[in-house]
């Protein structure tokens, strides 16, 4: 693991490209407006009512796909499978492809784990009451660092994970980005279907996770891994799986 971090450090230092803009201002501006509009228009009706039973059942079926545990395990598996392939395969092309897979695993791991950690810290620091307690506290009740999950609604941790994961795939495979965005919205909104979060919690989580994926992609591009930087600073996925 020490060699892994040393390799990243060398790549970072060798890069002659300056750090591109992180676009956090634009992301924050759009997210704040979407969150405020959601709070004004949707959060109160959602908190005051219950989703119909079929909708809640659908949400319960789908919401588990946004759990970070299986995504983290999958990313670790990709990383070590790729590393093993790099050592065992013979041709230069096969080795390059195996290494590419391992870096995809590393990218997904960093994106999902660190965005999730930050989101969980934020939700504890903000301490917004969940929709289950709307009739007791309303939608603008906050108890920072209460240590109780009832006051850990904003932003949604599941939605952060979903936003990070599907944004990562949208950056890696931009041809399918519309499908990935649709999946992220659907899985994020399952948290509203099951009554665990307000829509504004989900919007904030999806946006934060997606921006964190962009940030991580920029850092990887700066190190020459998986991505390259376009003239405007946007990370573009490298392609190693072309046919011969």
UniProtKB/Swiss-Prot annotation:
Could you confirm whether the keyword DNA-binding appears in this record? no
SUPFAM superfamilies registered for this protein in UniProt? Acid phosphatase/Vanadium-dependent haloperoxidase
Is Lipid biosynthesis among this UniProt entry's keywords? yes
GO cellular component terms listed in the entry, alphabetical order: plasma membrane
Q: How does it sit in the membrane?
A: Multi-pass membrane protein
Q: What else is known?
A: In this strain lipid A lacks phosphate groups, and both tetra- and pentaacylated species exist.
Would you tell me the protein name for this molecule?
A: Lipid A 1-phosphatase
Q: Could you tell me which species this protein originates from?
A: Rhizobium johnstonii (strain DSM 114642 / LMG 32736 / 3841) (Rhizobium leguminosarum bv. viciae)
């Amino acid at each position: 693991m020490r060699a892994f971090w040393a390799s990243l450090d060398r790549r970072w230092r060798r890069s002659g490209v300056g750090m591109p803009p992180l676009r956090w201002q634009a992301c924050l501006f759009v997210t704040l407006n979407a969150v405020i509009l959601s709070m004004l228009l949707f959060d109160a009706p959602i908190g005051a009512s219950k989703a119909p039973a079929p909708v809640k059942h659908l949400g319960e079926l789908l919401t588990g796909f946004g759990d970070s545990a299986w995504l983290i395990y999958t990313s670790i598996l990709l990383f070590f499978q790729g590393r093993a392939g790099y050592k065992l395969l013979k041709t230069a092309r096969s080795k390059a492809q195996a290494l590419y897979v391992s870096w995809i695993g590393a990218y997904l791991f960093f994106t999902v784990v660190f965005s999730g950690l930050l989101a969980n810290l934020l939700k504890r620091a903000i301490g917004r009451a969940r929709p289950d307690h709307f009739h007791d506290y309303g939608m603008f009740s906050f108890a920072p660092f209460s240590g109780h999950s009832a006051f850990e609604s904003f932003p949604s941790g599941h939605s952060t994970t979903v936003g990070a994961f599907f944004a990562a795939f949208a950056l890696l495979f931009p041809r399918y980005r519309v499908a990935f965005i649709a999946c992220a919205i659907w899985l994020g909104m399952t948290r509203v279907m099951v009554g665990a979060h307000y829509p504004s919690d989900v919007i904030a989580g999806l946006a934060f996770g997606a921006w964190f994926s962009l940030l991580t992609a920029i850092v990887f591009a700066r190190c020459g891994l998986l991505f390259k930087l376009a003239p405007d600073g946007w990370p573009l996925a490298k392609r190693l799986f072309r046919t011969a």
